[in-house]
Design a protein with these regions (language model features):
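Arg/Lys-rich amphipathic alpha helix in sigma70-family domain 2
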Residues: 74-93, 118
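Sigma70-family region 2
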Residues: 11-12, 49-65, 83-85
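Acidic, proline/glycine-rich intrinsically disordered inter-domain spacer in sigma factors
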Residues: 16, 98-127
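A short, charge-rich alpha-helical start-of-domain segment used by transcription regulators
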Residues: 2-31, 35, 41-44, 60-61
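A short pre-motif secondary-structure segment
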Residues: 139-143
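C-terminal edge and immediately downstream basic/flexible tail or linker adjoining helix-turn-helix-like DNA-binding
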Residues: 1-12, 16-18, 89-91, 155-156, ...
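Short, small-hydrophobic-rich alpha-helical interface motif
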Residues: 29, 33, 43-54, 69-72, ...
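Helix-turn-helix DNA-binding module
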Residues: 130, 134-135, 146-163
Length: 183
């Protein structure tokens, strides 16, 4: 099931340069931003802004880049969400924003039936993630989907490690209930 703990990964080597770090984290950052913003263009803007801001921190030790980048990206996503809700609050009903979010499916290797099932399960997961409170969604995305450790997730979210564990536990419980209800 999708809400179980991921297998322990071997320690990731520290990238040799900031360019290599940004190139490696870009696709995951885009998926994270797209899940939070629900619009492809806004997600691309948020990731680009976060990468540009990271250039100002290139002198920091490479071990700090991961937590720093996710923290910058998370704050940028929150800023864009606030601006969008303020600007569009009076002009467009909120329901219309969810209708135009599309998902790209790049994996062509599996057969049609398997691809359809993966798409359905992913759509259910995305829908369930969108129903979570923001902090629980962030904790789940950073900890499980992005495979960050608890300390790095706590730094990125600006909270304690205990809060990360609490948010993650509640997110997993809620996701498991929602996903079991759809089966």
């Amino acid at each position: 099931m999708l809400v179980t703990s991921p297998p322990l990964m071997p320690p990731v080597a520290v990238p040799a340069s900031l360019d290599a770090f940004l190139a490696g984290i870009g696709p995951r950052a885009f998926r994270f931003a797209e899940a939070g913003l629900r619009q492809r263009d806004d997600a691309l803007d948020a990731v680009q802004d976060a990468m540009e801001r990271m250039l100002g921190y290139r002198e920091r030790p490479a071990e700090e880049w991961t937590a720093l980048f996710w923290s910058i990206l998370r704050r940028r996503i929150i800023d864009l969400q606030r601006r969008r809700s303020f600007r569009l609050k009076f002009w467009v009903p909120q329901e219309d924003h969810d209708q135009d979010s599309t998902i790209d499916w790049a994996d062509e290797a599996p057969g049609p039936a398997q691809t359809h099932e993966q798409q359905r399960e992913y759509a259910l997961l995305v829908q369930a993630l969108r129903q979570l409170p923001a902090r629980q969604r962030e904790a789940f995305s950073l900890r499980v989907l992005q495979e960050l450790d608890v300390a790095t997730t706590a730094k990125a979210m600006g909270c304690s490690e205990g809060s990360v564990k609490t948010h993650l536990s509640r997110a997993r419980d809620a996701l498991q209930k929602q996903l079991e209800a759809t089966r």
